[in-house]
Each structure stands twice: as structure tokens, then as C-alpha cells.
Amino acid sequence: MSQNGATVAYAPKEAMPIGDGKDKTEVFANSIHLSLQGKGGVGKSLVASILAQYFNARGKAVRCVDTDPVNRTLFQYKALNVNRLELLREGSIDQRGFDSLMETLLTEDATFIVDNGASTFIPLWSYILENSAVDVLTRAGKRLYVHTVITGGQALLDTLHGFKSLAESTSERNIIVWLNEYFGRIERDGKSFEDMGAYRESENKVFGSVHLTKRNQDTFGRDLEEVISRKLTLDEAIKDGPFSIMTKQRLKVMQRDWFEQIDSLTLL
């Protein structure tokens, strides 16, 4: 996938059993998935697009919403039928716009994917907390999952801070961590994410994780860059795209890796 003009490609790795696993036998047909991270350009929209493609492939009724007032990345995928939610009014975030989103989440039976921009991270999360939105959704039979990205490289500390702020402010065990190594290994002082204080202090809030490990950029990377430039889903590229046999094979490998990790989270 593409992040800030760069190609992202990943090697398969089993989803880590972060969390105690007690909730994983539960099934939430009408689940809601928020892609949230206060740091921009770390793969947040990538996560949203993978989730949308995954639930479509698993036969779920999927509704996608793009709330990013700056970068409408998810909205550009025609096959995902993404709805735009306008939150900017006279240059400021209109929090009442979230009322419209909540109304939709509460009244429609579907699996929702909501891609939130970095600029609306604090307003949306504040709205959820101040309005006890999780309780409202739970009473309506909806399960909310919060997907957040931890990335290596220079943005490691910023993304850890975003994760920590989410974990400290939620009372639910509903955070799914996406460990994105595109910008570098996720390590600090020789410790992996699971050994860092940020995780240890909040592991009871983590439902599970998906590990995105970088692949060979000369093959998988170039193939994915072409798919993204055409704004195609992986299914579109594999079935009808103007690509070689081996390109389609590499796309299948990538798709299988991601989907199997999400399967292990038991989100269906």
C-alpha cells in the first residue's frame, strides 16, 4: 500500500495474541471499527481499507465512512462505496457532525469502518468519551473496536503517545494495535512493543494486534504501488486488473496474510 507517496509491502507474520483472549469467543455481527491515531501519515487509512476489504470478503454488509477533513484517502476507493462526513465548518471542527455519525451507527445493521483524520482525532475521541457513546452503542447491541497504528522510525514515540492516550481514557478492552514496520522496527531501548511500558501498563485494554512487517520493495512494493495508484481493491486487481500472473500471485499472498491475522482476532 502507499503511505505519503511511498510503497508499503509486508511479509506474513502470525497475529500476536496480545491481551488475555477472554473475549475472543464472542461474536459481534454489527461491529464498528474506528481507525484512530493522532499522528498523520502512519498507515491509518491503510488499516481502514484493509478492514473494509476483509469484511467484504467475509460476506458482511459493510458501510465505510471517511471523516478526514484533509485527506480523503479511503473515499477514493469506488469499490468500497465510502460515504463522506463533513466535519469542518468555517475552518473549525463541528462536533455536532458526530451526532449524524452516531445516528447512522445506531440505526443501521452493518459492519462499519470509520476512517478518522489526524486533525479530528482529539475531537472525535472527546465526543465519544463525553457522550458515553460506547455505552449507547453497547445498549444497541453494537460492539466498538478502536484500531490504532504503532509505527517504527521517527514517529514511534508519537504513535505510542496516541495509543497511550486511547488506552488510558477507555474502560473497554477494545483496542486493536496495528504494528507497522514500514518506517522501521518497532523497538525502543532494545524492547519490542509487548515489552514497553506503554503496552504493559495498558495490556488489559488491548483486544489483539495485527503485525505489518515490510516485504521486498522491488516486487511486492512495486505491485502494490500500481494497485494503489489505480485506486483498486486487492480483489479488483486480482480478478480483473491488467497485471501479470506473478503480480496477482503476490497480491494474493499479501491479502491472505492480512486476512488470516484478522481472522485470528475473531471479529466476525
Report each predicted region and the residues it spans.
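Catalytic cores of phosphodiester-bond-cleaving enzymes
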Residues: 17-25, 157-159, 165-169, 246
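Conserved catalytic-core segment of NTP-binding enzymes
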Residues: 120-222
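Glycine-rich phosphate-binding P-loop
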Residues: 35-49
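NTP-binding/hydrolysis catalytic cores, primarily Walker-type P-loop NTPases
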Residues: 225-268
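Long, basic/Gly/Ser/Thr-rich N-terminal segments
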Residues: 1-16, 181-185, 189, 214, ...
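Extreme N-terminal, non-catalytic leader segments
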Residues: 1-34, 100
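Nucleotide-state-sensitive switch-loop elements of NTP-binding domains
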Residues: 23-34, 48, 57-121, 126-127
